[in-house]
């Protein structure tokens, strides 16, 4: 039976102050009426004399004694008088014994023979106990005399109580007398801090020291200290144990008295009185001075008492004794005592007269022991009334007795359960089998733990030596585990005892406080009552007052004693805690060494066996070669035999053998799941799965291994808790976790633990939900509720203080301070206080459990704050664990761990199925495109062949499980007409869900409406509606939208609707929510009076959603992108000729909208694709990684995309019979003064740019862009640079001439801008695009909307205010100005609060003060006076044409010379370039022209395009790149001039295709003007890189190669299987 750690609840419950009772928590203790028992014994005249000698004494616990007719004894143990777990009897000094004998001689009478027997031997008193019974009459004088002496003795003890040592004053359980001495369950011999653990269980020499030493020390005590001796009751006798020999005459007896005498030879119980007396005399003579175990009592020799007490507790052991072993039938007085048929447990104490052999045989039993009584809680056994088996004498030196006496130790540490009979080790060890558990138990009890673990044997040793080494290591490991278990049990018992004593002392201290308080109240009450009457105080009253005051002083002294003892116990617990840490450290080192040696030996043994087998095969092969040479073997037979041998050799490869060995040994040393550290388990599983991963390179694996080790290092450092965790260590752990998560290593338990240990993750997906945010949110909500409650102010302050303690605790952790024991105790008290106040924050409380904080009053009382840090570690509740210490190598467990941690390329089952379904679509794409659909009857035009093929593909996809895809045909192939054909070919049959939603840029909406009106027959009754704009362009309800067949809306308008629909409760929490919220969940947070957009109602489900120019949602963070992805629709389509323009992340936004699983989840997309294309120092991927990612992109696009270029052919013919397009690059170099100007500007700007880039201050990035802009302008014309600089100099800092009303007002407006608005300024600076005209911004001529942070051109401010003030969202302010909505985000800005970017830069980036601003104001006023006189106006007449102007004029002149009708489109990013070009076209060449720029309103733009088509004289169109690169059809022109290169090559291609599309009948010529040896060279290089990346993924030829891959190859590419 396993030994249970002892918890001693030491409670004094006696009339005498020197008696202790220790209750073990492993038993059920019945209430004991000790006083009643004492009274019975005294009334019966039972007095127990003790010898003057201080040697050990024999005693018997007797409740009631009688002699039956058959002269046998029977012990009747009443339930109400059950003996306690351990009775601490006081050891009497020589002085005490003499006084006691004098008293007893007076009491017992003058019988000569009997008195001599009592005086000469302690056996006499024992014999008298057997003779006394109820029938013996007692004289009244004797009773009176006895009672008087008892009272006198009690008074004497009470008088001496103040002189007794404070460490050994006992406490009556009812609070009558003094306190108890806490149990010292481990003595000084247990030195746990030794580096080399003594685990041999050999007794210390101090334990068997000569008792004469104690006698001498006792004789030297101060006799004056003890003035009274209490009457000895049955509890005063020393408890001793023995086993009983049985005789045949006792088998039928009914009554027994169990003698508990622990000595070498057990005496036989006498069958009659004389035999009893002689036996007692003989045994007393044998053990005199040796057998008694002294118990702590009222003595002043503290050092001696502590030594004896520690020795006693060291040998306490719970020893169950089966009742069936007794030869007598034991009965209870009360029938209910043994109703549960339990096992009787008897108290056992060690005897010091045992010889060395006997003690050794029982040493392991006595090492960790406690006194055990009869328990109703133990295992059920035979009933008491049914047991009549004879008692058999056990031989203490037999092997059976040894095995039965050694208690089983249940290990509470995380010791691995190693099956040393595992097949792998058995196979490696050969015929040398491992010893059985029974044999090992016998051998291990006497063996000594070896100091060091055997090292690895040489690789060339023989097989026999390897097997021998392995067997030795197995045995050593078994002994190591056993010894560690033993040592652990010792430590845990010590800690448990100290912990229990601390608990009791705390209870007693609280009781002492109450007693002092009650006594003080009583004393004050007496004083008050006597003072109230005004009469003289009588002597009786004075006695009462004095007695009350004395009682109060005594109670205060007792309280102080208890406090001192509690401090002493806590100090002991701290020492044990340090010993525990040292033990755990040494345990881990020893285990690791042992396991490593065991693994190496097993591997080497197998390797040796493999080498021997290979040598045998090679020898056979040589023999066959010799036989073939000699001609004794035919060639066919030789070939067959050598083939078999070669197959054996192939099967015996050492490399494979090593891998197999390691994998097979690992399950052997694997710990039970329930007892392993789940954090370490997660890390180990991640490493294991990474090792098995086939799609990662070795370099990547090594990097990830290093990051996993960083996390383990941080965890260990935090849990050690000895010092502050520095910022660098936390940063390393944070970066490692981020990189691992990005690389697909998903370990929820690890990341949650790191967050709880103070790591703050910027990516909310790593820990979702955010436990840290929930922690502080709970506290904030609790504060709010308490402040609004009706509780008293005192209660509110108390609760607030508790909440502050819990909040500060977590803040300390986030700062890098690990929790200390004192902090845990303080937070535990706060939690208990909150619970008592009724605050239910269960999640918060459970989160605190991770830091081992008690959350209930019971836990707070029971758990000492000094208990070891890593004791009782429990796994999280959501971890499904099945304890299995035997079979830990099952495949099911390995698979569950893979799914549990979601390591990269080991997807969850759902992701795997989704990827397989996606790969099925890859194989179907070829067959789908083979078909051809007919043109719908409701169309007014016939579809071209490639369009019919496209329509067939679109219809097939809608009939599949994908329900949508990407139509990425080249510009001009008719994506719009194919989409219209799809809407007509697959119209909805349900009137409730028939609406097609078409989202497009504003400039394209009119084109769509026109196409629908002209391409669809009227009989189709296909209704359309444009949502937005002025007039009746908006509806409020979904039912109004659902009436139309097609609803057209711009991206900007849809984003505004999403913004207005957003619940007010979630304002400011967008970043904490999913990027694509669920509409129904979102609407639950709205109130009835909020705005409901018809696009986002619960019933809003469109039949089909089409995104034209889908690249507009490429930024996943924009509101337009989120709005498009949130809308519900049955079918979802993206139309875009350039779905990828800058990075692979742009593709994710489209996948997210299409909801293609599993890559619609950002984590999955980044894991397999996105992360390999990021340029960051954190992500170190080689070319092979990127190639694999590109293959995945092609597979993905092949499954969801249809892309055809104009060069593609069908049946040998191109898709479109278009004339050719010729792209010419007209390269030139700067010369003369222009070259000097550019060179000087470049040198100056390079120096400034270097300085700015090295400066990390805000605003430096925009300054670098300005310098780069100047270089690009210089390539076009040097005058552009001058105009830009003059504009910058003349830029107004603020409108208005009043410093207070204008400048200072705007200054404060900027300083009060929200953080979100300031962040938006930085975002707008990155794009350098005006939100109104979409033109490129010029830093010297742009302003900031203070309400939202968007940037706008100075020239666009007036039209923006004019149009926006007419919108219904605009509001008129008190001053008459309008608060107008931003076109992009709908946030309001007062028209007078639009500030220049120059002022914003001065205030935010340069940190201007009011004084600086005033100085700038004065300088500005002077500049304005000068500028009024000298306003810079370019002198166009004196301007010389630049190289770019000359190139442009040459192209125009050549075109005009070759044709009288051909028209030209000229694209540029700089509208100021058009001003210079206009001068030369108008004045020098006299060529008419038109201009199309973003500052024009929609009507003006439309008029320009119509005039360009109709007027044959207007052959030149100047068009800005931003305003006209998409949405326009300009096939009336066939010449395109690109003046300056744009960052994005696809923007240029879109501009070119404005005229190269369907209906173009002329050859198209593209003229790209280029300046060599300038900044345009570097822009061209950037274009080339972007184009290579996109083309590598979008190349139709490479995408088609995917179709040649088999199913297995595709699965391998995505990590689903091996090749």
From Swiss-Prot:
Q: Where is the Helicase ATP-binding domain?
A: 956-1157
The domain of life is Eukaryota
Family recorded in the similarity comment: Belongs to the SNF2/RAD54 helicase family.
Q: Determine if Magnesium is one of this entry's keywords.
A: no
Which residues are involved in binding ATP?
Answer: 969-976
Q: Which UniProt keywords apply?
A: Activator, ATP-binding, Helicase, Hydrolase, Metal-binding, Nucleotide-binding, Nucleus, Phosphoprotein, Transcription, Transcription regulation, Ubl conjugation pathway, Zinc, Zinc-finger
Source organism of this protein record: Saccharomyces cerevisiae (strain ATCC 204508 / S288c)
Cellular location of this protein?
Answer: Nucleus
* Name of this chain's protein: ATP-dependent helicase ULS1
Segments of skewed composition (Polar residues): 86-102, 200-210, 242-259, 269-279
- SMART domains reported for this sequence: DEXDc, HELICc, RING
The GO molecular function terms of this record are: ATP binding; ATP-dependent activity, acting on DNA; helicase activity; hydrolase activity; SUMO binding; zinc ion binding
């Amino acid at each position: 039976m396993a030994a249970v750690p002892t918890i001693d609840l030491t409670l004094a419950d006696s009339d005498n102050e020197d008696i202790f009772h220790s209750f073990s928590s492993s038993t059920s203790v019945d209430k004991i009426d000790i006083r009643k028992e004492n009274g019975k014994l005294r009334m019966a005249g039972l007095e127990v004399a003790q010898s003057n000698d201080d040697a050990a004494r024999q005693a018997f616990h007797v409740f009631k004694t009688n002699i039956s007719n058959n002269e046998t004894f029977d012990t009747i143990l009443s339930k109400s008088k059950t003996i306690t777990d351990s009775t601490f009897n006081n050891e009497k000094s020589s002085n005490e014994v003499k006084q006691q004998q004098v008293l007893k001689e007076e009491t017992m009478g003058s019988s000569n023979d009997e008195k001599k027997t009592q005086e000469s031997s302690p056996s006499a008193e024992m014999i008298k106990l057997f003779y006394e019974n109820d029938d013996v009459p007692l004289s009244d004088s004797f009773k009176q005399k006895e009672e008087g002496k008892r009272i006198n003795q009690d008074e004497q003890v009470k008088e001496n109580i103040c002189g007794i040592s404070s460490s050994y004053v006992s406490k009556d359980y009812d609070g009558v007398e003094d306190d108890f001495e806490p149990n010292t369950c481990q003595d000084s011999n247990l030195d746990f801090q030794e580096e080399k653990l003594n685990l041999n269980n050999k007794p210390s020499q101090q334990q068997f020291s000569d008792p004469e030493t104690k006698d001498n020390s006792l004789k030297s005590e101060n006799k004056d200290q003890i003035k009274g001796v209490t009457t000895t009751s049955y509890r005063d006798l020393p408890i001793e144990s023995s086993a009983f020999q049985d005789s045949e005459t006792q088998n039928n007896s009914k009554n027994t008295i169990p003698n508990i005498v622990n000595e070498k030879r057990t005496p036989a119980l006498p069958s009659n009185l004389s035999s009893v007396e002689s036996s007692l005399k003989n045994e007393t003579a044998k053990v005199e001075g040796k057998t008694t175990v002294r118990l702590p009592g009222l003595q002043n020799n503290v050092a001696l008492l502590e030594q004896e007490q520690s020795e006693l507790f060291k040998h306490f052991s719970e020893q169950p004794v089966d009742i069936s072993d007794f030869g007598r039938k034991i009965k209870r007085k009360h029938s209910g005592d043994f109703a549960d048929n339990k096992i009787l447990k008897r108290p056992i104490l060690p005897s010091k007269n045992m010889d060395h052999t006997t003690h050794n045989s029982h040493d392991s039993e006595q090492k960790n022991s406690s006194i055990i009584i009869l328990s109703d809680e133990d295992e059920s056994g035979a009933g008491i009334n049914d047991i009549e088996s004879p008692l058999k004498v056990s031989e203490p030196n037999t092997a059976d007795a040894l095995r039965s006496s050694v208690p089983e130790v249940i290990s509470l540490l995380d010791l691995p359960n190693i099956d040393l009979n595992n097949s792998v080790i058995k196979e490696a060890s050969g015929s040398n089998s491992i010893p059985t558990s029974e044999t090992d138990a016998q051998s291990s009890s006497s063996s000594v733990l070896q100091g060091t673990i055997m090292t690895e044997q040489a690789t060339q040793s023989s097989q026999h030596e390897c097997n021998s080494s392995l067997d030795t290591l197995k045995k050593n490991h078994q002994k190591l585990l056993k010894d560690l278990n033993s040592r652990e049990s010792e430590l845990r018992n010590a800690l448990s005892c100290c912990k229990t004593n601390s608990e009791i002392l705390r209870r007693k201290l609280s009781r002492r406080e109450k007693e002092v308080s009650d006594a003080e109240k009583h004393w004050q009450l007496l004083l008050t009552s006597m003072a109230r009457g005004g009469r003289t105080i009588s002597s009786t009253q004075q006695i009462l007052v004095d007695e009350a005051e004395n009682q109060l002083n005594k109670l205060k002294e007792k309280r102080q004693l208890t406090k001192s003892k509690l401090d002493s116990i806590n100090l002991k617990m701290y020492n044990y805690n340090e010993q525990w840490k040292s033990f755990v450290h040494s345990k881990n080192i020893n285990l690791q060494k042992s396991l490593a040696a065991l693994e190496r030996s097993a591997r080497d043994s197998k390797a040796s066996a493999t080498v021997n087998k290979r040598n045998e095969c090679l020898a056979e092969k040589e023999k066959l070669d010799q036989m073939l040479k000699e001609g004794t073997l035919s060639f066919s037979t030789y070939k067959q035999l050598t083939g078999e041998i070669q197959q054996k050799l192939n099967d015996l490869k050492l490399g494979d053998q090593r891998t197999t060995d390691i994998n097979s040994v690992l399950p052997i040393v694997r710990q039970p799941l329930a007892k392993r550290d789940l954090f370490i388990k997660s890390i180990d599983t991640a490493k294991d799965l990474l090792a098995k991963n086939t799609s990662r390179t070795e370099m990547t694996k090594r990097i990830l291994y290093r990051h996993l080790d960083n996390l383990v290092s941080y965890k260990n450092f935090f849990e050690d808790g000895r010092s502050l965790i520095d910022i660098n260590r936390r940063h390393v752990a944070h970066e490692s976790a981020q990189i691992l998560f990005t690389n697909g290593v998903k370990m929820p338990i690890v990341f949650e633990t790191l967050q709880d240990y103070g790591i703050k993750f910027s990516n909310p997906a790593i820990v979702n939900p955010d436990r840290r945010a929930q922690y502080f949110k709970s506290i904030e909500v609790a504060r709010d509720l308490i402040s609004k409650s009706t509780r008293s102010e005192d209660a509110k302050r108390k609760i607030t203080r508790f909440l502050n303690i819990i909040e500060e605790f977590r803040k300390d952790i986030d700062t890098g301070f690990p929790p200390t024991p004192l902090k845990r105790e303080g937070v535990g008290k706060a939690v208990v206080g909150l619970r008592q106040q009724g605050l239910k924050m269960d999640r918060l409380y459970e989160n605190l459990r991770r830091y081992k904080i008690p959350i209930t009053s019971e836990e707070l009382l029971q758990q000492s704050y000094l208990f070891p840090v890593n004791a009782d570690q429990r796994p999280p509740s959501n971890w499904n664990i099945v304890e299995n210490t035997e079979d830990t190598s099952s495949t099911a467990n390995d698979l569950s761990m893979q799914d549990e941690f979601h390591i990269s390329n080991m997807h969850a089952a759902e992701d795997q199925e989704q990827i397989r379904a996606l790969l099925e679509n890859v194989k179907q794409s070829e067959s789908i495109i083979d078909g051809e659909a007919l043109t719908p009857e409701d169309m007014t035009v016939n579809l071209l062949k490639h369009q019919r093929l496209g329509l067939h593909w679109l219809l097939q996809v809608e009939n599949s499980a994908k329900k949508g895809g990407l139509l990425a045909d080249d510009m001009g192939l008719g994506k719009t007409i194919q989409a219209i054909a799809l809407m007509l070919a697959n119209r909805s049959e349900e009137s409730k869900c028939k609406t097609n939603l078409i989202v497009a840029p504003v400039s394209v909406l009119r084109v769509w409406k026109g196409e629908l009106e002209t391409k669809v027959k009227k009989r189709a009754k296909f209704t359309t509606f444009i949502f937005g704009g002025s007039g009746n362009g908006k509806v409020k309800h979904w039912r109004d939208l659902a009436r139309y067949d097609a609803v057209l809306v711009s991206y900007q308008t849809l984003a505004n609707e999403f913004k207005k629909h957003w619940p007010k409760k979630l304002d400011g929490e967008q970043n904490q929510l999913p990027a694509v919220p669920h509409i129904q969940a979102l609407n639950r947070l709205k109130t009835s009076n909020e705005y409901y957009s018809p696009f986002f109602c619960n019933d809003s489900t469109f039949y089909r959603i089409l995104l034209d120019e889908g690249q507009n949602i490429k930024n996943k963070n924009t509101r337009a992108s989120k709005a498009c992805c949130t809308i519900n629709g049955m079918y979802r389509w993206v139309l875009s000729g350039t779905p990828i323009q800058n990075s692979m992340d742009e593709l994710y936004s489209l996948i997210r909208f299409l909801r293609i699983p599993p890559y619609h989840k950002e984590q999955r997309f980044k894991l397999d694709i996105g992360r390999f294309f990021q340029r960051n120092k954190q992500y170190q991927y080689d070319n092979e990684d990127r190639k694999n990612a590109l293959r995945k992109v092609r597979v993905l696009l092949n499954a969801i995309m249809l892309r055809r270029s104009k060069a593609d052919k069908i049946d040998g013919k191109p898709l479109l019979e278009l004339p050719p397009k010729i792209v010419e690059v007209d390269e030139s170099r700067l010369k003369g003064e222009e070259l000097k100007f550019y060179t000087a500007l470049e040198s100056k700007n390079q120096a400034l740019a270097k300085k700015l880039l090295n400066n990390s201050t805000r605003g430096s990035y925009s300054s670098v862009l300005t310098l780069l802009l100047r270089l690009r302008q210089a390539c076009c014309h040097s005058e552009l640079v001058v105009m830009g600089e003059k504009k910058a100099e003349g830029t107004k800092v603020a409108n208005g001439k009043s410093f207070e009303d204008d400048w200072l007002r705007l200054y404060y407006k900027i300083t009060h801008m929200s953080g979100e608005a300031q962040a938006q300024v930085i975002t707008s600076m990155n794009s350098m695009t005006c939100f109104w005209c979409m033109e490129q911004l010029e830093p010297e001529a742009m302003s900031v909307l203070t309400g939202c942070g968007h940037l706008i051109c100075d020239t666009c401010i007036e039209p923006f205010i004019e149009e926006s003030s007419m919108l219904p969202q605009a509001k008129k302010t008190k001053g008459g100005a309008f608060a107008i909505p931003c076109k992009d985000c709908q946030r309001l800005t007062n028209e007078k609060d639009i500030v220049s970017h120059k002022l914003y830069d001065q205030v935010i980036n340069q940190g201007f003060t009011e004084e600086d601003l005033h100085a700038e104001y004065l300088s500005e006023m002077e500049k304005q006076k000068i500028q009024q006189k000298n306003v810079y106006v370019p002198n166009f007449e004196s301007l010389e044409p630049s190289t770019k102007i000359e190139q442009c004029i040459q192209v125009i002149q050549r075109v005009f010379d070759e044709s009288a009708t051909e028209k030209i489109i000229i694209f540029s990013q700089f509208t100021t370039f058009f001003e210079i070009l206009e001068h030369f076209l108008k004045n020098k060449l006299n060529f008419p022209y038109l201009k199309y720029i973003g500052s024009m309103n929609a009507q003006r733009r439309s008029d320009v395009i119509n005039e360009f088509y109709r007027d044959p004289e207007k052959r030149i169109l100047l068009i800005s790149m931003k305003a006209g690169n998409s949405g326009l059809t300009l096939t009336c022109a066939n010449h395109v001039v690109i003046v300056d290169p744009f960052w994005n090559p696809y923007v240029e291609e879109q501009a070119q295709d404005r005229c190269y599309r369907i209906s173009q009948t002329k050859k198209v010529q593209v003229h790209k003007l280029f300046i060599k040896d300038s900044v345009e060279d570097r822009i061209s290089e950037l274009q080339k890189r972007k184009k290579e990346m996109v083309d590598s993924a979008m190349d139709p030829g490479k995408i088609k190669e995917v179709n040649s891959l088999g199913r297995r190859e595709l699965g391998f590419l995505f990590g689903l299987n091996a090749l």
